[in-house]
Amino acid sequence: MNFLNQIRKPKLSDIELIAMDLTSEYMSIDSERALFRKLSADLLPKVERSVYNRRKRRLFYHRDLLRKKLAWTIGLQDYYIVDSMPLEVCKLSRSSRSSIYKKAYETAPDKGYYASQNNSYYGYKLHAVCILDGVFTDFDLTQASIHDIHYLKNIKSMYSDCTILGDKGYLSVDYQRDLFSHKQIRLEVPMRRNQKNYKS
């Protein structure tokens, strides 16, 4: 089965390519070179590395749809974990020369701060929600300067009647009240040291 409209019918179908990609992720193969070394002899002539990479990018929407369907077939959970991580595009000293996605402000990378590493970086921020077993149910990419707390607006539209565990970056009494009053989402966040009633 093929999702993409291609002039020449590929030897490896889109479903096979997605299956190959997901299998490589499951096997913790994180480079294409390692993947193509492990491919069986009958699969090697069906796809070239450059074509594989291009088709894989074009099939992202279908992979994401599959991931969401899998996440929801696992079923609604009582507990979820929300977190974010930096995605550095280039070193901060080279950010003025970087031309990656700078045509539109909405997609342009920018300067952000990563508290756990205590440093600034240039790029994006990946926000993700997963269940306790580690299966991702949702993720989003934002500019690096976007505060973690703003991702909770997305959570409000997708989840209800659950507990979400987050780090101190998601600490906001207003957001906690809003999530609970509208969707019965309990946001559990550790207290900061300078907070009232803090216990070590």
For the regions a language model picked out, list residue spans one by one.
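Short alpha-helical elements
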Residues: 1-200
